[in-house]
Amino acid sequence: MKQIWQALKAHQQAVEHRAILDLFADPRRAETFSTRLGDMLFDWSKTNIDHTARDLLIDLAGAAGVAEKREAMFSGAKINETEGRAVLHTALRNMDRPVRVDGVDVTPALRETHARMQAFVRDLRSGRFKGQGGPITDVVNIGIGGSDLGPAMACLALAPYADGPRCQFVSNVDGAHIHDTLKDLDPATTLVIVASKTFTTIETMTNAETAKRWMATRVSDPAAQFAAVSTAADRTAAFGIDASRVFGFEDWVGGRYSMWGPIGLALMIAIGPEEFDAFLAGGAEMDRHFREAPFAENLPVLLALVGLWHNQICGHATRAVLPYDQRLARLPAYLQQLEMESNGKRVAMDGHELTHHSGPIVWGEPGTNGQHAFYQLIHQGSRIVPCEFLVAREGHEPDLAHQHLLLVSNCLAQSEALLRGRSVEEARAILARKGLTGSELERQARHRVFPGNRPSTVLAYEKLTPATLGRIVALYEHRVFVEGVILGINSYDQWGVELGKELALALQPMLEGRAGTEGKDGSTAQLVSYLRC
């Protein structure tokens, strides 16, 4: 692999100052550097990757053992080596084929849990399951991290399909979050879902207790309007939640990969079991494509290789995710966790420190909002930010088709502007037409130059349906896997979240005045003194 890395770096240095636009002298450039899956088109032709770079990147994936590790993952091998676990979130959307963990086929249990979820959701949506004040009108999902970001993103994304109770999400331990969520709801017609695998997550359980007290202000049996997504049956029982409303999942489903199963309960309530199954089917379709398509035509592999080229080879530290779809407003935040918690590591699988950078910083906002915020830096800043645009051919509001046309035209315009830029000669001509001359024209022209030659990709699709969202989420999941394999890291643990938790527990008695700050650094001690409650 070392030789391939070196060859990639040498090639990148040789073509670093080449105009990407010049690559389109090849009339088949766009077609050759695009890949399709059904109605989905991934266009990566506006990058500086040429045939040589593409072939080297594909060789890199082969040398890293992506194909072998991919089959190990799907087969239930314990590829999460630091925790000794399989990685089988894919089984949640592929329940029609046996998958064995430690020699046991896990799919019958998955199908049973899925059927229990469907039955509960149908009862709730039909009104057979009622609150103590009538049919359930609102659902509040309490969770954090993977128990929040995925289902919250998906519920917003699939709002046109949401014909069930209103679903809201509480994650932050900041009391303002749960206060503002509950203040206009009726406890007697609200269901609260507590999503915590261990039922010990401090933020989630603090909010759950607050919700239970709120529920008790209107109903005689608060726990009767709670459901849980947890494997801790003893703790859910102690909380008062009946076992029929407790849905568990296995330790081989990581939190940030878990919305395909019980963590997606709120999503299933919102859109119904049939549309939820369409979401699963979309993910399963991407799984099949990922397993079967050759690397040169494989969307997750190519998305990963483009990302590796920009981050590891070109040295671009960030990646902007720019969905031109307001209902995908939460996608960048979801992908922040998916990618940065998975591949934000500094130690390789063998325990040695990495000799290269790990995953990039992922951020973004929906278009066109971002155009009036941070696109200034993307177009004219001194750092190059590779951009990933997402856009649908068709919206959900036929009476607002003219607005969707504006949306799509803006998306394509931004992608083209990043590629093409605007030269100083073009800027001068524009200013001259406005009547400027001489030194003032020259001064102003410099400010109106767009360097261009900034890479971007576009993921286009017909319409944001449940199946399409399933394909998109699975695409990014597998992208993370491929990047992690090539970087030599474990994408499925998250030890980086632990230290802060431990220190927070120690700081609580100090902030309450029950303990001194001995042993703390001067800054922390000063802040404790100032913020003491």
UniProtKB/Swiss-Prot annotation:
Positions annotated as active site in the UniProt record: E341, H372, K501
A cellular component annotation (GO) from this entry: cytosol
Function according to Swiss-Prot or TrEMBL: Catalyzes the reversible isomerization of glucose-6-phosphate to fructose-6-phosphate.
UniProt KW Cytoplasm keyword: yes
Gene that this sequence comes from: pgi
An annotated GO BP: gluconeogenesis
Cell location: Cytoplasm
This protein's UniProt keywords: Cytoplasm, Gluconeogenesis, Glycolysis, Isomerase
UniProt-listed Enzyme Commission number(s): 5.3.1.9
Reaction equation(s) it catalyzes: alpha-D-glucose 6-phosphate = beta-D-fructose 6-phosphate
UniProt organism field: Cereibacter sphaeroides (strain KD131 / KCTC 12085) (Rhodobacter sphaeroides)
Superkingdom of the organism of origin: Bacteria
InterPro entries to which the protein is assigned, alphabetical: G6P_Isomerase (IPR001672), G6P_Isomerase_C (IPR023096), Phosphoglucose_isomerase_CS (IPR018189), SIS_dom_sf (IPR046348), SIS_PGI_1 (IPR035476), SIS_PGI_2 (IPR035482)
Family membership: Belongs to the GPI family.
Pathway: Carbohydrate biosynthesis; gluconeogenesis; Carbohydrate degradation; glycolysis; D-glyceraldehyde 3-phosphate and glycerone phosphate from D-glucose: step 2/4
Name of the protein in question: Glucose-6-phosphate isomerase
GO molecular function ontology, one term from the record: carbohydrate derivative binding
Keyword Isomerase carried by entry: yes
